[in-house]
Amino acid sequence: ESYAIVVQKGIKEESVEQPIEALDASGDLAIGTEVTNNSTFRLTLNELYYTAKPSYKTGNVTYSYGIGDYHLVCKLDYTNLDTQALRTWDTSRIKDLKLTFAGEYTYDGVLWIPESKIVPLASGYAFLIFEVPRNIEDSTDPLMLTFSVDGSVFTVNCR
C-alpha cells in the first residue's frame, strides 16, 4: 500500500508528492492539502471558518446543525474508498476531534455530513464542528485542530 500527501501551490502543474510511511503516521494539513489512503479514504482540507449559525446549502435545501452559539468549522472534501458508507454523526471512522487553544484549553468537536451519508466510492462534504468562545477568532494565541480518519492522525494549524 502507498499513501501520499499532495500539496498544490500556484498553478496546477506545481505539485509535490510526499509519501506517508504508515497508515497511523501523523500528517500536517493546510488548506488545499489532499491526503489519500488508497484503501479507505481521500480527503482535502477545503476551508476553515467561524460562524454563529452553521449551515450548508445545496440547491434549494439548507442543512443546519445547531449546537451552541459560535463555531469553528473545518470543511473537508471526502471521498469514501471503503466498502461501507460514512454516515452523519458516525464516530467510528472520523473521530478524536480536538481543538486546542493557547496550548491549554481543549474543545471537543463533532462530525456532521449534510447528505446523511457518503456511500462507497462517492464524494461529499464532511464538517468538523467545534463550539468555541467568540474571542478565539480574534486572538493570536495558537489554535491547533487534531482528528483521526481510519487510524491516520491529522493536525491543522488554524492560525
Regions found by a protein language model. Give the residues of each.
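Conserved functional micro-motifs across diverse proteins
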Residues: 1-159
